Amino acid sequence: MKIKTIFTVLFTLIAFGLSAQSNTEGETFQLTKQGAHYVFTASINGTADATILVESGIPALLADSAFVFSSGILSDMELTVASKEKLSLAGRVYKITHKANGTVHIGNNTSYIGDVFVLSNYDYGPYEVAVPVMYLHDDLDDGSRIVSLDLGNHSLQMLGKASLNGIKADYSKSNMNTDTYEGMFAIETSMTLDDGIKPRTLSGNFMIDFGNPELLFLLHQTEEVQRFLADNADMELREATTPSGEVVGQFILTKQCQLCSIAFPDAVVVITKNLPLFTTPGNIGLKFFERTHAILDFDQSVVYLKGI
């Protein structure tokens, strides 16, 4: 009887341990939409809270110099003075005052690992820090890089491998790669738009761009887009203009745009010449992620998607 009781207790403890492990959830950050961007507030290195911009296309964690030195958030890192180095972002050029490389703790159980650039006059006020999500690590899951992004519910969560395995069957799966400008992550997929005449398809790499407020930008300079436009010469292209009348691009009004096998009715697809260095045919923007639940597994270069 005593042996049976011992085995029962052991089985219960083992089962509880496995259950606890499988249900371990990473840290969740509540997002706020600020203009055309998403931000969250979290402690940096346990020193001070910062407003943090969610980014996908920057090479390092960026921090405003005035905030860095007034708050002491990077006081434990070895900062090297940068000489005459600059960083161009969204048409603006910032002076890099200091650089570092290492681990920056964000919140309670999340870490950023990589380069750190301290910038002069980096939008101090709206946000103090910007972080590229592909370098966020889950401290509760052996440093895994799996980010669950649910912009519809204003949520960014670090998702453990066990949690992902339990839900990924409910999502469509696409591969990602970094065969792009500056090694940004892109989804290998296709876009099919229906403009009321016929469906038209463009396949290739579509870069993830949280700096793009639209559903999709097509990059005019790429061979794929040039071929797409030539093959669809009957498609109506409308001019995109500024309030002053300056033409800044073109756009296509669609009855439906299907991207990554998810349908977006009455979508607008923008054709731009303003991103001349980008090499992918398309950039997927925030309106896509506001209508989907995306799980980005940067360790395995896979994205799981589900429309909402």
Whereabouts are the PLM-identified features?
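Bacterial Sec-dependent N-terminal signal peptides
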Residues: M1-E25
